[in-house]
Each structure stands twice: as structure tokens, then as C-alpha cells.
Amino acid sequence: MTQEPLILEYDGRRFYELSVRGFKRLLPLIQVSEDTWIAYFDSLGDKEFIEHCARELAPHLKDCDVLMTSESKGIPLVHEIAGILGHSRYIVCRKERKPFMENPIAVKFKPITATKEIELVIDGRYIPLIKDKRIGIVDDIVSTRQTMEAMEKLATTAGGKVTRKVAVLIEGEHHKDVIYLGVLPIFKKTISRKP
């Protein structure tokens, strides 16, 4: 895979055209600091895009026994991939403990979109679905790897072995162990500083 640039110069544009294996979406640019803009990517509700990405990612997960994702943006993607692969179940890691959970397994982490540490949790009843299985981790965007690493820790704590990690997009840096379909660049403007 050719390595696309992770950082582009901000040129005043309001939108960025994302192309994922020939499928295009126009994303608004959002300013997140004085010199930085990000392309806002929200796949929730975009059935056509999710189906396209699932078809592209599914072949990389065919040797996995169980798929795992975190709520909420990964759910439609993993659901579609599970259907393609004929999996009747998949694991969703929740971002908080739920009263119905029995003996939950939890990992603390700080995603890029949060201001404080949160927990990623799976119900203890999922352990038999994970134990001694080959796990494929599915995410929409991988930036800092915090969420993906938390999912991997949950899978291994439950006795599974993570054999594949896939994402629609990466942002911020290339990750050798993650199969991805495209790059979501960060846009930077050079700030002139007065002496």
C-alpha cells in the first residue's frame, strides 16, 4: 500500500474530498486549534459507504473466529462485515459498565475525542465467545491507537488471540499492524511568529 501523506498544508478550503478505494465523500474541515484542522468523518447512517468498506475489509478478516469493535461508530461496520463472513455474533466493547453485565472485564483508556479517561468494558458472559479464539478487531478510524489497544487488552484478558486489526481510516500516523483503506489527513497552517 502506498503511504499517503498524513499532514497536508491548510489552504483555506472548507471541505476535503475523501476517497476510499474509489468511493468518495466530501468532508467538512473543522478547526481544532489555531493552526490545525481535521476532516470530520462520520459514517453513522451512511449505509452505502459502510457496505463498500465492509466488502473491502472482510477478506482480511476471513480467518478470524470472532470480530470485536467498540461502540458506537464501529458497530454498523462490524455488523456488515460479520454478515459478509457468515458470523452470527460479534463483540461490542461498551464505553461504560451496564447494570445487566455479569463479571465485566474493563480497561481504562483515553481516546483522542475525550477529555478524561474512560473505561472500555465487555460483559463477562462474552468470555466463552472469545476464549481460545482468533479475534479480529474492527474500528472506523485509528488515530492514537488508544481504543484499539484497549480492545486488544480486553480480548487477551478474556483469553482470545488478536490476529487481525482493521480500520476504514488512519489519522496522525501509519500503523504497520493495522490494515486500513485510507488516510484521513490532518491540515496544518504555518503560523508566523513575531520576534
What are the roles of these predicted feature ranges?
Residues T2-D11, E149-P195:
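PRPP-dependent phosphoribosyltransferase catalytic core
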Residues P76-L85, E152:
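Short Gly/Thr/Asp-enriched flexible loops that form oxyanion-binding sites at enzyme active sites
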Residues S88-I135:
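Short, glycine/charge-rich flexible loops or terminal/linker lids adjacent to PRPP-binding catalytic cores
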Residues D139-E152:
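Acidic, divalent-metal-coordinating active-site segment for phosphoryl/phosphodiester hydrolysis
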